[in-house]
């Protein structure tokens, strides 16, 4: 009966040990004495606790916490990545800057500006071109209006000038022609008076020669002046009294000169006493 009572306790203790201890440290001994069994239980517990502590220490010493290791590794990796990414980022930024600068230089060398600047320039050029076209159209319209007005003004001024010339030039020409004709008429009258005086008081041969020498150039000058006046007048016809008769040459005698008087001069011959007696006789 004693054995029968001891068996369930042993089984319970073995079950408890199996639940408390890991599977590889399950140790069960079946002894007959209850007194011997109790100290064994305490020893087993202490041994189990010591073994579990040693096992945990070994695990702590040999196998550290994987989460901590992973966190430390991630921190180290992050530090390395940040430490490596900082120079990489700085070098990348420098490369980007160099590329931008080189692209700007290339764009400036080729086209003078970069695409962004080209877009801005194209927009500015378009706006400027539109404003320039608008201004040019306005200027063209203003110029056309100004030209039309200037043409109208010039046409009016030309018409006014032509009318003024038509009004003024005849008076000037008329005064010029009349003055020249009056001068030529006066010269001819002087010549006629000289020849009339020669009849009443005959001149010497020297005076006659000088008179004939003066007569030729004077008549020529008068004729040229009159012809010029006629050409200037365009309208006034030549007067009949200005057309001179054939002038005698320098070798002609006084009788021939008397036979060819100037136009408008009357022939007056001196009458002798015998002729008067003949005329007075019945």
From Swiss-Prot:
Its Gene Ontology cellular component terms are: nucleus
Which parts of this chain are annotated as the region Disordered? 1-96, 249-282
Residue ranges annotated as compositionally biased, kind Polar residues, are: 13-31, 58-68, 79-94
Alphabetically sorted, this entry's keywords are: Nucleus
Q: Where is the composition biased (Basic and acidic residues)?
A: 1-10
Q: Where in the cell is it found?
A: Nucleus
Q: Which InterPro entries match?
A: FRG2
Family membership: Belongs to the FRG2 family.
Which PANTHER family does the entry link to?
Answer: PROTEIN FRG2-LIKE-2, PROTEIN FRG2-RELATED
This chain's protein is named Protein FRG2-like-2
Q: Which organism is it from?
A: Homo sapiens (Human)
Lineage of the species this protein comes from: Eukaryota, Metazoa, Chordata, Craniata, Vertebrata
């Amino acid at each position: 009966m004693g054995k029968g009572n001891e068996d369930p306790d042993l089984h319970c203790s073995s079950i408890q040990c199996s639940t408390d201890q890991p599977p590889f440290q399950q140790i069960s001994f079946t002894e007959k004495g209850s007194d011997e069994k109790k100290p064994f239980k305490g020893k087993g517990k202490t041994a189990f606790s010591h073994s579990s502590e040693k096992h945990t220490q070994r695990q702590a010493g040999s196998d550290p916490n994987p989460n901590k290791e992973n966190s430390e590794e991630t921190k180290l990796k992050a530090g390395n990545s940040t430490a490596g990414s900082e120079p990489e980022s700085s070098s990348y930024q420098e490369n980007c800057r160099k590329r931008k600068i080189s692209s700007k230089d290339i764009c400036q060398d080729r086209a003078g500006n970069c695409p962004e600047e080209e877009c801005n320039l194209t927009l500015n050029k378009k706006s400027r071109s539109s404003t320039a076209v608008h201004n040019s159209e306005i200027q063209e319209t203003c110029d056309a209006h100004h030209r039309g007005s200037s043409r109208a003004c010039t046409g009016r001024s030309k018409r006014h000038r032509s009318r003024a010339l038509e009004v003024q030039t005849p008076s000037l020409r008329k005064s010029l022609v009349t003055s020249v004709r009056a001068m030529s008429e006066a010269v001819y009258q002087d010549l006629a008076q000289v020849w009339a005086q020669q009849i009443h008081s005959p001149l010497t041969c020297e005076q006659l020669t000088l008179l004939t020498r003066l007569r030729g150039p004077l008549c020529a000058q008068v004729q040229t002046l009159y012809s010029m006046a006629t050409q200037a007048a365009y309208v006034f016809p030549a007067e009949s009294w200005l057309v001179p008769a054939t002038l005698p040459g320098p070798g002609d005698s006084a009788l021939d000169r008397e036979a060819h008087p100037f136009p408008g001069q009357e022939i007056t011959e001196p009458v002798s006493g015998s002729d008067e007696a003949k005329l007075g006789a019945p």
